[in-house]
C-alpha cells in the first residue's frame, strides 16, 4: 500500500469515527405520545443489552444511559454504530410528585417502550 492508499484509509477511518460520534450525540430516535393518563416514550436502541440500559427521571427530565462492549478480532474497516448513548430529554408533561419512576418499561427487539404516569393536579372541594 502506497502513501495515497494509506492516507485514504486513515481519512475514511477518521470520517467513520466522526460519524459514529455524531450518531452517539443525536441517537437514539425517540417518539412520544400522550395516551390518557400516560406518556408513552418509544426509544430505538438496537444492539444494546437490557442490563446495560439505565433510565432515570428527575422532575420532567428523562435520562437515558447505555453502553455496550464490542469485541473485534479483525481489522475494523468501517465503524458507525454507537457504543454509548447518554441522552437527556425534557418530557412535555409534569411527572407526579414522588412518582418519578416509570410506570412500566419493556425492551424487546431493540425497542424500549416506557409508560410514564402524568400529573393531573388536585381536585379542590368548595365549602
What positions do the PLM features span?
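Alpha-crystallin/small heat shock protein
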Residues: 1-127
Amino acid at each position: 500500500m502506497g502513501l495515497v492508499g494509506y492516507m485514504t484509509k486513515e481519512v475514511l477511518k477518521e470520517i467513520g469515527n466522526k460519524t459514529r460520534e455524531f450518531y452517539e450525540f443525536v441517537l437514539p430516535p425517540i417518539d412520544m405520545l400522550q395516551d390518557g393518563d400516560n406518556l408513552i416514550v418509544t426509544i430505538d436502541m438496537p444492539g444494546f443489552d437490557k442490563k446495560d440500559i439505565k433510565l432515570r427521571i428527575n422532575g420532567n427530565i428523562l435520562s437515558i444511559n447505555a453502553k455496550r462492549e464490542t469485541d473485534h478480532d479483525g481489522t475494523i474497516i468501517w465503524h458507525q454504530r454507537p457504543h454509548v448513548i447518554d441522552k437527556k430529554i425534557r418530557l412535555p408533561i409534569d411527572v407526579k410528585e414522588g412518582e418519578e419512576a416509570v410506570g412500566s418499561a419493556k425492551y424487546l427487539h431493540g425497542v424500549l417502550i416506557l409508560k410514564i404516569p402524568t400529573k393531573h393536579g388536585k381536585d379542590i372541594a368548595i365549602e
